[in-house]
């Protein structure tokens, strides 16, 4: 895959449920602590190395931000780092929280 794909929250949720992909959240620490998808890994400059060690390059990665804009740059970056399949989640955490309020965790 040379380019990331955009995915809606329903499809992202299904991929998580079926363990077909991992989810990363690139929002700032305060926003992440105030609410994030239950299975999300908080991906920051400080946690990138650990994420890359723990997730093979053939593992599909879904990137979540606030509204689905910043995630596009991060998705492209992960492709450049060697990940084979990367998605940017349309609508970001705002859409996730609206559609799946029971699947939001709080705290870091």
Curated annotation (Swiss-Prot):
CDD domains referenced in this protein's UniProt entry, alphabetically: GlpE_ST
EC class: transferase
UniProt EC number: 2.8.1.1
Xref: InterPro entries: GlpE_sulfurtransferase, Rhodanese-like_dom, Rhodanese-like_dom_sf, Thiosulf_sulfurTrfase
Induction line: Expression is positively regulated by cyclic AMP-cAMP receptor protein (cAMP-CRP).
Record's catalysed reaction(s): thiosulfate + hydrogen cyanide = thiocyanate + sulfite + 2 H(+); thiosulfate + [thioredoxin]-dithiol = [thioredoxin]-disulfide + hydrogen sulfide + sulfite + 2 H(+)
SUPFAM superfamilies associated with the record: Rhodanese/Cell cycle control phosphatase (SSF52821)
Entry keyword Cytoplasm: yes
GO biological process: glycerol metabolic process; sulfur utilization
Disruption phenotype: The deletion mutant displays no apparent growth phenotypes. The mutant is capable of growth on glucose, glycerol or acetate minimal media without supplementation. Deletion of the gene decreases total rhodanese activity by about 10%.
GO molecular function, a single term: thiosulfate-cyanide sulfurtransferase activity
Domain Rhodanese, first and last residues per copy: 17-105
Keywords per UniProt: Cytoplasm, Transferase
A Pfam family reported for this protein in Swiss-Prot or TrEMBL: Rhodanese
GO cellular component terms, A-Z: cytoplasm
Enzyme active site: 65 (cysteine persulfide intermediate)
Subcellular location field: Cytoplasm
Miscellaneous section: Overexpression of GlpE can complement the growth-defective phenotype of the thiosulfate-grown cysM deletion mutant.
Family stated for the protein in its record: Belongs to the GlpE family.
Record's subunit section: Homodimer. Monomeric in the crystal structure.
Name the record gives this protein: Thiosulfate sulfurtransferase GlpE
Naturally occurring in which organism (per UniProt): Escherichia coli (strain K12)
């Amino acid at each position: 895959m040379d380019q990331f794909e955009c995915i809606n929250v329903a499809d992202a949720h299904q991929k998580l449920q079926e363990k077909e992909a991992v989810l990363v959240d690139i929002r700032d620490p305060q926003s992440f602590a105030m609410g994030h998808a239950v299975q999300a890994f908080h991906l920051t400059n400080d946690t990138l190395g650990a994420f890359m060690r723990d997730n093979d390059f053939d593992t599909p990665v879904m990137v979540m931000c606030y509204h689905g804009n910043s995630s596009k740059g991060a998705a492209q970056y992960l492709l450049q780092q060697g990940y084979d399949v990367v998605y940017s989640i349309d609508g970001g955490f705002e859409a996730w929280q609206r559609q799946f309020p029971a699947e939001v965790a709080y705290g870091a």
